[in-house]
């Protein structure tokens, strides 16, 4: 699911922490500084290549490169389909619980490699194997799977799309009229995703040679994925992959069985191990407890240590200090008659202060990446426009040596062209269909809003893709938030501005995100000798799979769990209410905020910028200990229970690294992926049991001594 410009690796850390910001392609298995272990290996490979003696492609020189059609095999897409379902369920669960989605690249790559190896071994045994499993086919699988489960993230099921629903709207008193509400339905969701998810794939296709070959943008995540795949297809890499899959399977089984065991004790609200007051009843009341979730222990093992510590610090600051103090102001700062879930009461402080932190962090990183992108682009243009001149004034022949790897990769990358007419014509055609069709789904979203979005989208997509190539940051969610404010304010409250803002966010995020993702895939394909055509086709097929699979998975959750999206439940969908309230702010302004809430928002907005600035200016040894504002913002709204899970995960990883660093780097991502996948897949049978009205037989609940005495007295009477 990074070699960042700042020494602290902060950019990668920030991307690990918000569902709308964290990209699934960024850095699987990062160390304490936020640098992916895959990327460290990729960097080492790059350094070795520059030195000369080490060459990746010389190791594969005796293996024929299949044509782009041969890279697109039936078995690749069959395996991709089933893996896409599995990872879509996992991402959907993460989306609807806390919104923290770690990179699942390692598990996707491992399982794709393992299942096709299994397939080919079985066919080879009966003598029917026609085509061996190649790294190009492996790249096709990886691209297809990540594109498919990426829709579960970028489709907005935990953010803008679900934020339109009545469930989320009725938690606020503003803009909850029919004009600003649209309840989920599988039909229009699939249609919407098909309309907005493909146009981004066409936006930057003509620029792939410029971005990958001419500018030689690094795309660290794409490079890391390619290095992983190249490693699988060496004898040593295949042996390690087999061991990693074994560890993943072991912890997958443990996590799945544990989820099944826990289910027996959840017969009512507040029952089961997930409501265990491990730190005491008062701490439990303030959402400090360990909920025995393998998922977030696994997430903690994948996320950098600073992310996990930042989340815990955010929980302590908010639920340990701020909210109890503000609760004491009940009757003064807000009406005593209001419930804690009212946005005019304590809940308003929780939601809007977290929004202030997210926006401050997002604005800072947007400006920083924009400056770096512009500076890098200017330097690149100057470099390319300078003509070397000899002493007599005539042009010199370039003497820069091209390595064997670069020469071979460039030759094959430029071999299979994607016609520009397909890209330009496809963009115009899909845009025209979207402009005509989207207003049928959202009548409030006028055709000229969509036209304006599509006119500016390619420019923004280029900025995002170029920035991601330099820094590995994808700011798709930031562009989406800008769309919320711009289009929401343009439409106005009386014309369904909240719904317009959320829908425009989806349009903009989908274009900008998929364009950047495709360029990452082209970089992976470039480094594994996979054809750009096969990469493009795989991305299109994966996106089409995701447009059907993701809404179906969400619909399963939506129908199986009645309280989805409600604060304090198993699936609170925290970012759905955050995004909706951003849209309300864009339309109505700050008039609805509780007393002193705006002042606190200003303080935390400024604090987010100041903390980020301190991280960038401080020496790397100091910067890596400065917390991340985006990570701190997450528990402000939903509580600290998952922060404790993640902290336990980071402690396990830290101790493992102290005992045996090499083994931890090799197997920790696989163990973490097993914990996440097993618990995530248990959600599928749990949903089926809920739909079949099969209820758990036992309620395990914890009471204080006084309440227990009252219950005993009541039962005695």
Swiss-Prot record:
Tissues expressed in: Expressed in root cortex and stele.
Can you tell me where the transmembrane regions are? 76-96, 99-119, 144-164, 186-206, 248-268, 306-326, 351-371, 422-442, 450-470, 482-502, 536-556, 593-613, 636-656, 671-691
Any single GO molecular-function term of the entry would be: oligopeptide transmembrane transporter activity
Establish whether keyword Acetylation is in the entry: no
| Record carries keyword Transmembrane helix | yes
Region Disordered: start-end pairs: 1-56
Instruction: Say which domain of life the source belongs to.
Output: Eukaryota
Q: Which InterPro entries match?
A: OPT (IPR004813), YSL-like (IPR045035)
Cellular compartment(s): Membrane
List the GO cellular component terms: membrane
The way this protein sits in the membrane is described as: Multi-pass membrane protein
Keyword annotations for this protein?
Membrane, Transmembrane, Transmembrane helix, Transport
Q: What protein family does this chain belong to?
A: Belongs to the YSL (TC 2.A.67.2) family.
* Biological role stated in the UniProt entry: May be involved in the transport of nicotianamine-chelated metals.
Protein name, entry field = Probable metal-nicotianamine transporter YSL12
Gene name, per UniProt, is YSL12
């Amino acid at each position: 699911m990074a070699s960042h410009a700042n020494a602290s690796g902060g950019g990668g850390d920030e991307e690990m922490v918000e569902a709308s910001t964290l990209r699934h392609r960024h850095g699987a298995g990062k160390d304490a500084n936020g640098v992916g272990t895959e990327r460290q290996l990729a960097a080492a490979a790059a350094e070795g290549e520059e030195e000369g003696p080490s060459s990746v492609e010389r190791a594969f020189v005796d293996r024929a490169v299949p044509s782009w059609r041969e890279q697109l095999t039936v078995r690749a897409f069959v395996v991709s389909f089933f893996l896409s379902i599995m990872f879509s369920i996992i991402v959907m669960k993460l989306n609807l619980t806390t919104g923290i989605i770690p990179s699942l690249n390692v598990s996707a790559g491992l399982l794709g490699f393992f299942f096709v190896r299994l397939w080919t071994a079985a066919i080879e045994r009966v003598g029917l194997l026609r085509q061996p499993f190649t790294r190009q086919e492996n790249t096709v699988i990886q691209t297809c799977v990540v594109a498919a489960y990426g829709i579960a993230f970028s489709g907005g099921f935990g953010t803008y799309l679900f934020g339109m629903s009545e469930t989320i709207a009725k938690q606020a008193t503003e803009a909850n009229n029919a004009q600003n509400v649209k309840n989920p339905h599988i039909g229009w969701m699939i249609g919407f995703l098909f309309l907005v998810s493909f146009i981004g794939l066409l936006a930057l296709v003509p620029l792939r040679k410029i971005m990958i070959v001419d500018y030689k943008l690094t795309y660290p995540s794409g490079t890391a994925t390619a290095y992983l795949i190249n490693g699988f297809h060496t004898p040593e890499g295949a042996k390690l992959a087999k061991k990693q899959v074994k560890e993943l399977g072991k912890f997958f089984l443990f996590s799945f069985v544990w989820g099944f065991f826990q289910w027996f004790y959840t017969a009512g609200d507040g029952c089961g191990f997930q409501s265990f007051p491990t730190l005491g009843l008062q701490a439990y009341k303030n959402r400090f407890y360990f909920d025995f979730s393998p998922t977030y222990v696994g997430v903690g093992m994948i996320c950098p240590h600073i992310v996990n510590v930042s989340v815990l610090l955010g929980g302590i600051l908010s639920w340990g200090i701020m909210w109890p103090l503000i609760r004491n102001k009940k009757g003064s700062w807000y009406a005593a008659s209001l419930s804690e879930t009212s946005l005019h009461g304590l809940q308003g402080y929780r939601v809007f202060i977290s929004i202030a932190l997210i926006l401050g962090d997002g604005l800072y990183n947007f400006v920083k990446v924009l400056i770096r992108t512009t500076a890098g682009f200017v330097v690149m243009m100057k470099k390319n426009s300078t003509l070397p001149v000899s002493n007599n004034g005539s042009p010199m022949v370039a003497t820069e040596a091209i390595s064997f790897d670069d020469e071979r990769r460039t030759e094959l990358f430029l071999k299979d062209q994607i016609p520009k007419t397909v890209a330009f014509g496809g963009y115009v055609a899909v845009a025209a269909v979207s402009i005509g069709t989207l207003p049928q789904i959202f009548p409030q979203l006028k055709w000229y809003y969509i036209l304006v979005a599509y006119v500016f989208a390619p420019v923004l997509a280029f900025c995002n893709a170029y920035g991601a190539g330099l820094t590995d940051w994808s700011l798709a969610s930031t562009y989406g938030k800008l769309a919320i404010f711009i289009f929401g304010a343009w439409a106005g409250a009386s014309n369904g501005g909240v719904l317009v803002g959320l829908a425009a966010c989806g349009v903009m995020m989908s274009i900008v995100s998929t364009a950047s993702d495709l360029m990452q895939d082209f970089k992976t394909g470039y480094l594994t000798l996979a054809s750009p055509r096969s990469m493009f086709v795989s991305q299109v097929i994966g996106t089409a799979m995701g447009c059907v699979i993701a809404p179906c998975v969400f619909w399963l959750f939506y129908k199986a769990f009645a309280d989805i999206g409600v604060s304090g439940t198993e699936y609170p969908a925290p970012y759905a209410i955050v995004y909706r309230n951003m849209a309300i702010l864009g339309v109505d302004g700050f008039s609805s905020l509780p007393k002193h809430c705006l002042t606190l928002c200003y303080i935390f907005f400024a604090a987010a910028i100041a903390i980020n600035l301190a991280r960038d200016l401080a020496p790397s040894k100091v910067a890596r200990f400065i917390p991340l504002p985006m990570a701190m913002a997450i528990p402000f709204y939903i509580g600290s229970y998952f922060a404790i899970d993640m902290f336990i995960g980071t402690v396990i990883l830290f101790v493992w690294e102290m005992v045996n660093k090499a083994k931890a780097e090799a197997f920790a991502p696989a163990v973490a992926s097993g914990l996440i996948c097993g618990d995530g897949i248990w959600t599928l049978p749990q949903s089926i049991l809920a739909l079949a009205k099969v209820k758990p037989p036992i309620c395990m609940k914890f009471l204080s001594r006084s309440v227990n005495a009252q219950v005993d007295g009541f039962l005695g009477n």
